[in-house]
Curated annotation (Swiss-Prot):
Its EC number is 6.3.4.5. It catalyses: L-citrulline + L-aspartate + ATP = 2-(N(omega)-L-arginino)succinate + AMP + diphosphate + H(+). The gene is argG. PANTHER family: ARGININOSUCCINATE SYNTHASE. It comes from Shigella flexneri. GO terms for cellular component: cytoplasm. Pfam families: Arginosuc_syn_C, Arginosuc_synth. L-citrulline binds at Y99, N135, R139, S192, T201, E203, E280. Homotetramer. Keywords: Amino-acid biosynthesis, Arginine biosynthesis, ATP-binding, Cytoplasm, Ligase, Nucleotide-binding. This is Argininosuccinate synthase. Belongs to the argininosuccinate synthase family. Type 2 subfamily. Pathway: Amino-acid biosynthesis; L-arginine biosynthesis; L-arginine from L-ornithine and carbamoyl phosphate: step 2/3. InterPro entries: Arg_succ_synth_type2_subfam, Arginosuc_syn_C, Arginosuc_syn_N, Arginosuc_synth, Arginosuc_synth_CS, Arginosuc_synth_type_1_subfam, AS_cat/multimer_dom_body, AS_multimer_C_tail.
Protein backbone atom coordinates (compact mmCIF):
# COMPACT_ATOMS: atom_id res chain seq x y z
CA UNK A 1 0.00 0.00 0.00
CA UNK A 2 1.27 3.46 -0.89
CA UNK A 3 2.00 5.40 2.30
CA UNK A 4 2.20 8.91 0.81
CA UNK A 5 -0.62 10.06 -1.48
CA UNK A 6 0.39 12.69 -4.03
CA UNK A 7 -3.18 13.59 -5.02
CA UNK A 8 -6.42 14.12 -3.13
CA UNK A 9 -8.20 10.82 -2.35
CA UNK A 10 -11.69 11.77 -3.55
CA UNK A 11 -14.57 10.22 -1.62
CA UNK A 12 -12.41 9.11 1.30
CA UNK A 13 -12.13 10.32 4.88
CA UNK A 14 -9.12 12.54 5.54
CA UNK A 15 -8.11 13.70 8.98
CA UNK A 16 -6.53 17.13 9.00
CA UNK A 17 -4.61 18.61 11.90
CA UNK A 18 -6.62 21.83 12.02
CA UNK A 19 -5.22 24.95 13.66
CA UNK A 20 -7.88 27.36 12.47
CA UNK A 21 -5.31 29.46 10.64
CA UNK A 22 -5.52 30.46 7.00
CA UNK A 23 -3.53 27.52 5.64
CA UNK A 24 -5.53 24.70 7.22
CA UNK A 25 -8.84 26.56 6.77
CA UNK A 26 -8.28 26.93 3.03
CA UNK A 27 -7.02 23.35 2.76
CA UNK A 28 -10.08 21.93 4.53
CA UNK A 29 -12.52 23.92 2.40
CA UNK A 30 -10.65 23.02 -0.80
CA UNK A 31 -10.62 19.29 0.05
CA UNK A 32 -14.38 19.32 0.70
CA UNK A 33 -15.08 21.11 -2.58
CA UNK A 34 -12.91 18.64 -4.49
CA UNK A 35 -14.86 15.66 -3.16
CA UNK A 36 -12.95 14.41 -0.12
CA UNK A 37 -14.55 13.93 3.30
CA UNK A 38 -12.43 15.97 5.74
CA UNK A 39 -12.41 15.39 9.50
CA UNK A 40 -10.79 18.13 11.60
CA UNK A 41 -8.69 17.46 14.71
CA UNK A 42 -7.35 20.29 16.84
CA UNK A 43 -4.74 19.73 19.55
CA UNK A 44 -5.10 21.81 22.69
CA UNK A 45 -1.45 22.23 23.64
CA UNK A 46 -2.02 25.26 25.83
CA UNK A 47 -0.65 27.62 23.20
CA UNK A 48 -0.10 31.00 24.89
CA UNK A 49 -1.26 32.88 21.78
CA UNK A 50 -4.56 30.98 21.36
CA UNK A 51 -7.52 32.80 22.91
CA UNK A 52 -10.51 30.50 22.21
CA UNK A 53 -9.97 26.81 21.57
CA UNK A 54 -13.66 25.97 21.48
CA UNK A 55 -14.17 28.24 18.48
CA UNK A 56 -11.70 26.28 16.32
CA UNK A 57 -13.82 23.13 15.79
CA UNK A 58 -16.85 25.33 15.08
CA UNK A 59 -14.94 27.07 12.30
CA UNK A 60 -13.89 23.71 10.89
CA UNK A 61 -17.53 22.64 10.66
CA UNK A 62 -18.37 25.89 8.86
CA UNK A 63 -15.65 25.18 6.31
CA UNK A 64 -17.04 21.74 5.52
CA UNK A 65 -15.62 19.29 8.03
CA UNK A 66 -17.69 16.13 8.41
CA UNK A 67 -16.78 16.21 12.07
CA UNK A 68 -14.44 18.31 14.22
CA UNK A 69 -12.84 17.35 17.52
CA UNK A 70 -10.77 19.22 20.08
CA UNK A 71 -8.20 16.90 21.70
CA UNK A 72 -6.80 18.03 25.06
CA UNK A 73 -3.08 17.20 24.87
CA UNK A 74 -1.86 19.41 27.72
CA UNK A 75 -1.43 16.76 30.42
CA UNK A 76 0.58 14.47 28.15
CA UNK A 77 2.64 17.38 26.84
CA UNK A 78 3.67 18.46 30.33
CA UNK A 79 4.46 14.85 31.27
CA UNK A 80 6.82 14.57 28.31
CA UNK A 81 8.34 17.97 29.13
CA UNK A 82 9.10 16.88 32.69
CA UNK A 83 10.60 13.64 31.36
CA UNK A 84 12.87 15.69 29.09
CA UNK A 85 14.03 17.77 32.08
CA UNK A 86 14.69 14.64 34.14
CA UNK A 87 16.83 13.26 31.31
CA UNK A 88 18.47 16.50 30.21
CA UNK A 89 17.20 15.69 26.70
CA UNK A 90 18.53 18.87 25.11
CA UNK A 91 21.33 18.88 22.53
CA UNK A 92 21.23 22.39 21.05
CA UNK A 93 23.08 24.94 23.17
CA UNK A 94 24.86 28.19 22.35
CA UNK A 95 27.05 29.98 24.87
CA UNK A 96 25.47 28.03 27.72
CA UNK A 97 21.89 28.83 26.66
CA UNK A 98 19.70 25.83 25.90
CA UNK A 99 16.95 25.09 23.41
CA UNK A 100 14.51 22.93 25.36
CA UNK A 101 13.18 20.98 22.37
CA UNK A 102 9.68 22.32 22.99
CA UNK A 103 8.54 21.96 19.38
CA UNK A 104 9.77 18.34 19.09
CA UNK A 105 7.99 17.54 22.36
CA UNK A 106 4.79 19.06 21.01
CA UNK A 107 5.06 17.05 17.80
CA UNK A 108 5.55 13.80 19.73
CA UNK A 109 2.31 14.40 21.61
CA UNK A 110 0.31 15.81 18.68
CA UNK A 111 1.46 13.15 16.24
CA UNK A 112 0.36 10.29 18.48
CA UNK A 113 -2.78 11.67 20.13
CA UNK A 114 -4.40 13.10 16.98
CA UNK A 115 -3.76 9.96 14.95
CA UNK A 116 -5.17 7.86 17.81
CA UNK A 117 -8.33 10.02 17.73
CA UNK A 118 -8.56 9.61 13.95
CA UNK A 119 -8.25 5.87 14.30
CA UNK A 120 -11.22 5.88 16.70
CA UNK A 121 -13.27 7.60 13.98
CA UNK A 122 -12.20 5.19 11.25
CA UNK A 123 -10.02 7.81 9.60
CA UNK A 124 -6.82 6.34 8.17
CA UNK A 125 -5.55 9.20 6.01
CA UNK A 126 -3.80 12.12 7.69
CA UNK A 127 -2.96 15.59 6.43
CA UNK A 128 -1.19 18.49 8.14
CA UNK A 129 0.49 21.74 7.24
CA UNK A 130 4.15 20.72 7.39
CA UNK A 131 6.32 21.56 4.39
CA UNK A 132 8.85 19.33 2.66
CA UNK A 133 11.88 21.38 3.80
CA UNK A 134 11.19 21.22 7.53
CA UNK A 135 11.54 18.76 10.39
CA UNK A 136 7.84 18.30 11.11
CA UNK A 137 7.04 16.38 7.95
CA UNK A 138 9.31 13.56 9.17
CA UNK A 139 8.30 13.80 12.83
CA UNK A 140 4.60 13.54 12.00
CA UNK A 141 5.30 10.75 9.51
CA UNK A 142 7.10 8.67 12.13
CA UNK A 143 4.67 9.30 15.00
CA UNK A 144 1.64 8.79 12.77
CA UNK A 145 2.78 5.41 11.49
CA UNK A 146 3.86 4.32 14.97
CA UNK A 147 0.32 4.98 16.18
CA UNK A 148 -1.54 3.53 13.18
CA UNK A 149 0.32 1.08 10.94
CA UNK A 150 -2.44 1.40 8.30
CA UNK A 151 -2.08 5.18 8.08
CA UNK A 152 -1.69 6.93 4.74
CA UNK A 153 -0.38 10.47 4.41
CA UNK A 154 -1.92 13.20 2.26
CA UNK A 155 -0.44 16.68 2.52
CA UNK A 156 -2.02 19.45 0.44
CA UNK A 157 1.34 21.21 0.30
CA UNK A 158 2.78 18.21 -1.56
CA UNK A 159 -0.15 18.12 -4.02
CA UNK A 160 0.61 20.06 -7.22
CA UNK A 161 -3.11 20.60 -7.86
CA UNK A 162 -3.50 22.38 -4.52
CA UNK A 163 -0.30 24.37 -4.97
CA UNK A 164 -1.28 25.49 -8.48
CA UNK A 165 -4.62 26.80 -7.22
CA UNK A 166 -3.77 28.01 -3.71
CA UNK A 167 0.00 28.19 -3.55
CA UNK A 168 0.25 31.41 -1.54
CA UNK A 169 -1.42 33.18 1.37
CA UNK A 170 -2.96 35.80 -0.92
CA UNK A 171 -4.53 33.11 -3.10
CA UNK A 172 -5.86 31.27 -0.06
CA UNK A 173 -7.38 34.44 1.38
CA UNK A 174 -9.07 35.28 -1.94
CA UNK A 175 -10.37 31.71 -2.15
CA UNK A 176 -11.96 31.93 1.30
CA UNK A 177 -13.61 35.27 0.47
CA UNK A 178 -14.90 33.98 -2.88
CA UNK A 179 -16.51 31.07 -1.03
CA UNK A 180 -18.42 33.44 1.25
CA UNK A 181 -16.09 33.51 4.24
CA UNK A 182 -14.85 36.93 5.27
CA UNK A 183 -11.40 35.64 6.09
CA UNK A 184 -8.91 38.45 6.47
CA UNK A 185 -5.25 37.63 6.59
CA UNK A 186 -3.62 38.42 9.89
CA UNK A 187 -1.09 41.22 9.96
CA UNK A 188 2.06 39.90 8.34
CA UNK A 189 4.87 39.54 10.88
CA UNK A 190 8.59 39.62 10.19
CA UNK A 191 8.80 35.96 11.28
CA UNK A 192 6.57 32.96 11.94
CA UNK A 193 5.67 31.59 15.38
CA UNK A 194 4.73 28.12 16.57
CA UNK A 195 3.99 27.51 20.22
CA UNK A 196 2.72 25.22 22.93
CA UNK A 197 2.60 25.61 26.70
CA UNK A 198 6.22 24.42 27.03
CA UNK A 199 7.67 27.05 24.71
CA UNK A 200 7.51 29.15 21.57
CA UNK A 201 9.53 29.02 18.35
CA UNK A 202 10.12 32.12 16.23
CA UNK A 203 11.76 31.53 12.85
CA UNK A 204 11.77 32.14 9.07
CA UNK A 205 11.34 35.33 7.04
CA UNK A 206 13.50 38.10 8.54
CA UNK A 207 14.94 35.74 11.16
CA UNK A 208 16.56 33.70 8.39
CA UNK A 209 19.09 36.54 8.20
CA UNK A 210 21.62 36.51 11.02
CA UNK A 211 21.77 40.32 11.14
CA UNK A 212 18.16 40.25 12.41
CA UNK A 213 18.35 39.77 16.16
CA UNK A 214 16.05 38.88 19.00
CA UNK A 215 15.12 42.56 19.14
CA UNK A 216 12.63 42.17 16.26
CA UNK A 217 10.71 39.51 18.21
CA UNK A 218 7.66 40.23 20.33
CA UNK A 219 7.77 37.55 23.04
CA UNK A 220 4.50 35.73 23.72
CA UNK A 221 5.60 34.01 26.93
CA UNK A 222 7.77 36.67 28.52
CA UNK A 223 9.04 40.22 28.37
CA UNK A 224 11.48 42.18 26.22
CA UNK A 225 14.26 41.95 28.75
CA UNK A 226 16.67 43.68 26.33
CA UNK A 227 14.53 46.82 26.37
CA UNK A 228 15.80 48.99 29.22
CA UNK A 229 12.47 50.80 29.42
CA UNK A 230 10.81 47.55 30.58
CA UNK A 231 10.83 47.43 34.37
CA UNK A 232 11.81 43.98 35.65
CA UNK A 233 12.25 43.83 39.43
CA UNK A 234 14.35 41.02 40.87
CA UNK A 235 12.35 38.12 42.28
CA UNK A 236 13.16 35.17 44.52
CA UNK A 237 11.62 31.80 43.69
CA UNK A 238 11.96 28.41 45.35
CA UNK A 239 11.51 25.21 43.34
CA UNK A 240 11.01 21.86 45.05
CA UNK A 241 11.57 18.43 43.49
CA UNK A 242 10.64 15.03 44.89
CA UNK A 243 12.25 12.03 43.20
CA UNK A 244 12.91 14.07 40.10
CA UNK A 245 9.41 15.52 39.84
CA UNK A 246 8.72 19.24 40.36
CA UNK A 247 6.08 19.46 43.08
CA UNK A 248 6.08 23.02 44.44
CA UNK A 249 6.88 26.61 43.50
CA UNK A 250 7.41 29.07 46.34
CA UNK A 251 5.94 26.48 48.70
CA UNK A 252 2.73 26.14 46.69
CA UNK A 253 1.72 22.69 45.48
CA UNK A 254 -0.57 22.12 42.53
CA UNK A 255 -3.52 19.89 41.75
CA UNK A 256 -1.90 18.81 38.50
CA UNK A 257 1.29 19.31 36.52
CA UNK A 258 -0.42 21.50 33.93
CA UNK A 259 -1.15 24.15 36.58
CA UNK A 260 2.41 23.82 37.87
CA UNK A 261 3.86 24.43 34.40
CA UNK A 262 1.59 27.43 33.83
CA UNK A 263 2.82 28.97 37.09
CA UNK A 264 6.45 28.22 36.19
CA UNK A 265 5.84 29.98 32.87
CA UNK A 266 4.38 33.01 34.63
CA UNK A 267 7.33 33.27 37.03
CA UNK A 268 10.03 32.79 34.42
CA UNK A 269 8.17 34.87 31.86
CA UNK A 270 8.19 37.93 34.12
CA UNK A 271 11.96 38.02 33.54
CA UNK A 272 12.35 36.68 30.01
CA UNK A 273 14.08 33.60 31.38
CA UNK A 274 14.80 30.79 28.92
CA UNK A 275 14.94 32.85 25.73
CA UNK A 276 17.73 31.85 23.35
CA UNK A 277 18.97 32.31 19.78
CA UNK A 278 20.13 29.05 18.17
CA UNK A 279 21.61 27.90 14.87
CA UNK A 280 20.76 24.23 14.57
CA UNK A 281 20.98 21.30 12.18
CA UNK A 282 17.66 20.14 10.79
CA UNK A 283 16.99 16.45 10.23
CA UNK A 284 18.02 16.84 6.58
CA UNK A 285 21.37 18.33 7.77
CA UNK A 286 20.67 21.85 6.51
CA UNK A 287 21.19 24.55 9.11
CA UNK A 288 18.33 26.72 10.32
CA UNK A 289 17.99 29.48 12.88
CA UNK A 290 15.38 29.95 15.57
CA UNK A 291 14.69 32.19 18.54
CA UNK A 292 13.06 30.29 21.37
CA UNK A 293 11.11 30.97 24.53
CA UNK A 294 10.67 28.48 27.37
CA UNK A 295 10.44 30.29 30.72
CA UNK A 296 8.96 27.46 32.77
CA UNK A 297 11.19 24.76 31.30
CA UNK A 298 14.26 26.93 31.95
CA UNK A 299 13.27 27.56 35.58
CA UNK A 300 12.74 23.87 36.29
CA UNK A 301 15.90 22.85 34.40
CA UNK A 302 18.12 25.24 36.37
CA UNK A 303 16.80 23.99 39.71
CA UNK A 304 16.97 20.34 38.62
CA UNK A 305 20.59 20.54 37.49
CA UNK A 306 21.61 22.39 40.67
CA UNK A 307 20.31 19.47 42.72
CA UNK A 308 21.86 17.01 40.27
CA UNK A 309 25.36 18.42 40.74
CA UNK A 310 25.03 18.35 44.53
CA UNK A 311 23.64 14.82 44.72
CA UNK A 312 25.37 12.66 42.08
CA UNK A 313 29.04 11.86 41.55
CA UNK A 314 31.13 13.07 38.63
CA UNK A 315 30.81 9.97 36.46
CA UNK A 316 27.03 9.86 36.86
CA UNK A 317 26.79 13.54 35.93
CA UNK A 318 28.98 12.92 32.89
CA UNK A 319 26.71 10.09 31.75
CA UNK A 320 23.64 12.27 32.36
CA UNK A 321 25.02 14.94 30.03
CA UNK A 322 26.23 12.51 27.36
CA UNK A 323 23.07 10.41 27.30
CA UNK A 324 20.90 13.52 27.59
CA UNK A 325 22.44 15.05 24.49
CA UNK A 326 22.00 11.79 22.61
CA UNK A 327 18.38 11.56 23.74
CA UNK A 328 17.78 15.20 22.82
CA UNK A 329 18.92 14.53 19.29
CA UNK A 330 16.62 11.51 19.02
CA UNK A 331 13.75 13.66 20.29
CA UNK A 332 14.56 16.34 17.71
CA UNK A 333 14.51 13.71 14.95
CA UNK A 334 11.06 12.43 15.90
CA UNK A 335 12.36 9.29 17.65
CA UNK A 336 11.15 10.01 21.19
CA UNK A 337 9.35 6.65 21.36
CA UNK A 338 11.99 4.56 19.55
CA UNK A 339 13.60 1.75 21.52
CA UNK A 340 16.99 3.47 21.82
CA UNK A 341 15.29 6.56 23.26
CA UNK A 342 13.20 4.52 25.70
CA UNK A 343 16.35 2.77 26.91
CA UNK A 344 18.10 6.08 27.60
CA UNK A 345 15.00 7.57 29.24
CA UNK A 346 14.53 4.60 31.54
CA UNK A 347 18.16 4.66 32.65
CA UNK A 348 18.21 8.40 33.35
CA UNK A 349 14.85 8.49 35.11
CA UNK A 350 15.53 5.36 37.14
CA UNK A 351 19.09 6.00 38.31
CA UNK A 352 19.45 9.78 38.12
CA UNK A 353 16.06 11.46 38.53
CA UNK A 354 14.88 9.19 41.34
CA UNK A 355 17.42 10.75 43.72
CA UNK A 356 16.66 14.39 42.87
CA UNK A 357 14.79 15.53 45.97
CA UNK A 358 15.20 18.97 47.50
CA UNK A 359 14.69 22.72 47.11
CA UNK A 360 16.57 25.37 45.18
CA UNK A 361 16.07 29.10 45.73
CA UNK A 362 16.92 31.45 42.87
CA UNK A 363 16.95 35.18 42.33
CA UNK A 364 15.72 35.97 38.83
CA UNK A 365 16.67 39.28 37.25
CA UNK A 366 16.63 40.17 33.52
CA UNK A 367 16.62 37.53 30.81
CA UNK A 368 18.88 34.63 31.71
CA UNK A 369 20.58 36.55 34.51
CA UNK A 370 20.01 34.81 37.82
CA UNK A 371 21.76 33.73 41.03
CA UNK A 372 21.35 30.57 43.07
CA UNK A 373 20.71 31.61 46.67
CA UNK A 374 20.27 28.27 48.44
CA UNK A 375 20.25 24.53 47.83
CA UNK A 376 18.72 22.09 50.31
CA UNK A 377 18.43 18.31 49.96
CA UNK A 378 18.49 15.29 52.21
CA UNK A 379 20.40 13.51 49.43
CA UNK A 380 23.27 15.98 49.05
CA UNK A 381 26.72 14.44 48.84
CA UNK A 382 28.16 17.94 49.02
CA UNK A 383 29.68 18.04 52.54
CA UNK A 384 31.49 21.32 53.37
CA UNK A 385 33.30 19.73 56.33
CA UNK A 386 35.14 17.35 54.02
CA UNK A 387 37.13 20.13 52.34
CA UNK A 388 37.01 22.98 54.87
CA UNK A 389 40.16 25.12 55.00
CA UNK A 390 39.59 25.76 58.68
CA UNK A 391 41.55 23.93 61.38
CA UNK A 392 39.73 21.05 63.02
CA UNK A 393 38.80 17.42 62.58
CA UNK A 394 39.15 16.20 59.01
CA UNK A 395 38.01 13.11 57.19
CA UNK A 396 41.57 12.67 55.92
CA UNK A 397 45.03 13.88 56.96
CA UNK A 398 48.09 15.40 55.23
CA UNK A 399 49.74 11.98 55.35
CA UNK A 400 46.75 10.49 53.54
CA UNK A 401 47.15 13.03 50.73
CA UNK A 402 50.89 12.38 50.50
CA UNK A 403 50.13 8.70 49.96
CA UNK A 404 47.53 9.50 47.32
CA UNK A 405 49.94 11.80 45.45
CA UNK A 406 52.72 9.20 45.64
CA UNK A 407 50.46 6.72 43.86
CA UNK A 408 50.16 9.24 41.02
CA UNK A 409 53.87 8.73 40.27
CA UNK A 410 52.99 5.63 38.26
CA UNK A 411 50.85 7.34 35.64
CA UNK A 412 53.00 10.51 35.66
CA UNK A 413 56.03 8.39 34.72
CA UNK A 414 54.04 6.62 32.00
CA UNK A 415 52.83 9.94 30.58
CA UNK A 416 56.34 11.43 30.53
CA UNK A 417 57.70 8.42 28.64
CA UNK A 418 54.89 8.69 26.08
CA UNK A 419 55.60 12.39 25.47
CA UNK A 420 59.24 11.68 24.66
CA UNK A 421 58.16 8.72 22.54
CA UNK A 422 55.92 11.05 20.52
CA UNK A 423 58.89 13.42 20.09
CA UNK A 424 61.02 10.62 18.64
CA UNK A 425 58.39 9.97 15.95
CA UNK A 426 58.09 13.67 15.11
CA UNK A 427 54.58 14.16 16.50
CA UNK A 428 55.93 16.58 19.12
CA UNK A 429 58.87 18.99 19.02
CA UNK A 430 61.47 19.59 21.69
CA UNK A 431 61.07 22.64 23.91
CA UNK A 432 63.99 24.38 25.58
CA UNK A 433 61.72 26.36 27.89
CA UNK A 434 59.45 23.73 29.37
CA UNK A 435 61.72 20.71 29.33
CA UNK A 436 58.94 18.68 27.75
CA UNK A 437 58.10 17.96 24.12
CA UNK A 438 55.42 20.31 22.84
CA UNK A 439 52.88 20.47 20.04
CA UNK A 440 54.51 22.59 17.34
CA UNK A 441 53.24 26.16 17.17
CA UNK A 442 50.88 26.25 14.18
CA UNK A 443 51.98 29.81 13.38
CA UNK A 444 55.53 28.62 12.74
CA UNK A 445 54.58 25.66 10.56
CA UNK A 446 54.74 27.60 7.32
CA UNK A 447 58.01 29.39 8.14
Amino acid sequence: MTTILKHLPVGQRIGIAFSGGLDTSAALLWMRQKGAVPYAYTANLGQPDEEDYDAIPRRAMEYGAENARLIDCRKQLVAEGIAAIQCGAFHNTTGGLTYFNTTPLGRAVTGTMLVAAMKEDGVNIWGDGSTYKGNDIERFYRYGLLTNAELQIYKPWLDTDFIDELGGRHEMSEFMIACGFDYKMSVEKAYSTDSNMLGATHEAKDLEYLNSSVKIVNPIMGVKFWDESVKIPAEEVTVRFEQGHPVALNGKTFSDDVEMMLEANRIGGRHGLGMSDQIENRIIEAKSRGIYEAPGMALLHIAYERLLTGIHNEDTIEQYHAHGRQLGRLLYQGRWFDSQALMLRDSLQRWVASQITGEVTLELRRGNDYSILNTVSENLTYKPERLTMEKGDSVFSPDDRIGQLTMRNLDITDTREKLFGYAKTGLLSSSATSGLPQVENMENKGQ
